[in-house]
């Protein structure tokens, strides 16, 4: 039974004065809970919801819950995959209140005391709230009735499911591959290596990996299998591209001089100039910064192959250290540090000054708080225009407006994004314009290094701006090269430990929730001290920040990318939700150990399946994409790298109406859909026209055949008419009267004057029938039947045989000269003229015949 619908809106029940003081929203929320609603259901009585995915099970269900952000009542459900909020009555999913469990960063129980209660009351009533903070920039608050166990049930369900102790407790393992099967990513990595080496026609296979026959090479580089068992470097892929002149033994020696064994290897090579983009971790120069490795220096020097000019000069090498210089020096205490340009031939060391993972995590948290405080759907249920004494953007206090803008700047997120963009653009320019090689590293070479290298690849190679290439880029520079997705996302690893502190997911962070004066936290665990949480927490939105950088490039170069901003948002949602296994664990080695590709569904197959339904008109496809317009490197100037908030991601929860910033893109997509429909209609019309033309041609051919047959029949008819006229003249020359039968057939009756006794034909009835003779009932002294007979019938005619044997007018070779010979040919085309000679004796002659003869 659904909860009764409210008659009063939360925002309408309070006075304007209460809103001005900033406490009206909470008092409004309290009024609604005076209505009675059923308590949460037990697990055994859950409804069969249509919104559930494959293998998704309902664990906890609570009715009569309010989503404070939008003032909506409904049902809150905890499944083994999501926290789902369904609208009251219709049971439609409310997107803001529905969040995958893995996307939840933290949640906490909140208590709000009712300020409208009488002062003399002994006990002030309070209401129960649950705050949920997501990694996808949302902060939502759910309200529960007091004196019920709904909030406790939901809270305990989240507590059990948001932090699984084992990797295989994640929903992706329960669901399995389903219809989104995943091939082994090692095969795809080798195919990308083959493309980089100019061996794109070769295709990798698992048999090739098993027997080690994938070690191909070109003039400068080769694929090395020294790490095939992940012993040399557990966080590197099984195959590496290294200089062809470096042996496997030297590769192993060089790995000992780099942090975590992450030696310099090739990530991308220019197909024409030979310049490369390489990556590694920091060198282990020691406390005195005087440690060196001849093998490492040789390996780095081989990255600078000779230029293709006449002077055979060696190209320059840039060593790009992503860290601030002071951070690099601080790592000396732990044996790390940075290279000295004096030790590496023709090299230059450059520091980019990008902050560490902790700075990025705190920056995104501040940005999320800013958006929640100044968005249109706030987590305390009020509009940003009604906060802080009632000032508004249109006519409020300018100092307050400036303060809010300053808060956005204080978050530092856009500054960090610009740092990554600027560093990547600088790297791409060195490779494209100077034909120089660049070696990029940070401390461990898997966070800032992955950002810079992958973004520089995107700028340099148009292939990576397609759907297929973008997948290959992420699988190469993020997954294969060991970005620790489990630690950065707070998910369990192969060993079963989670990368986030045990208590962090259960507590409210300071400043993340704008609490009114009477609001208190009732979490079961005390929040950890800032120092301890900062040291232990390895979560950081590194990959999210890189996707943000890609969206900035997409904004600057709308014609250069095959995919759209909506594709990037869906990609991020899939990564954060852990619905698929592609981004599990911390390295390729761990994913191979668990068998992720066989046990879990594939994110890339899922996204491709979404696009297949609509083709190029799908929202993931960029309608402006023009591959010929940007078929080379993208080299943005520094002035163009000023980033902005990414509306489709940053504003979609706090400012839903403003998140649809791509109106032009949407209109273009609509026009593209219409054009596609018209194109299909045109193709259909052309197809029908071709079919009609074929039918017309066929009918024309039949008509021509009919005309030929008609012409032939007409010719035969004329010929027969001439022959008939000749026969008529021949008969009339005997002085006989010719009479045609009225039947219209080929039989012609010739009659003379009547006699008393009719004569019978000399032929028997059967003979007369065979030659077409018809006996008429009309009595006459002579009856002659004329019919047209076939040649085979004529051949059996005895008169014909007589004609053939006795005719004196035939040629020497036996040919007949009729009608030129002037004979009455019996076996001619006039065969069938049969005479009754007995009747001929009694033939009557017209009297006028003799008069004519005498006159002549």
Predicted regions, residues:
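Conserved N-terminal structural segment that caps and organizes enzyme catalytic cores in eukaryotes
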Residues: 2-7, 15-18, 69, 97, ...
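Anionic N-terminal interaction surfaces
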Residues: 2-78
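Phosphoinositide-binding peripheral membrane targeting modules
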Residues: 50-129, 133-135, 139-145
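Well-ordered beta-strand positions
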Residues: 76-77, 133, 269-271, 432
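A phosphate-binding catalytic loop at a beta-strand-loop-alpha-helix junction
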Residues: 278, 431, 436-458, 550
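Conserved hydrolase catalytic core segment
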Residues: 461
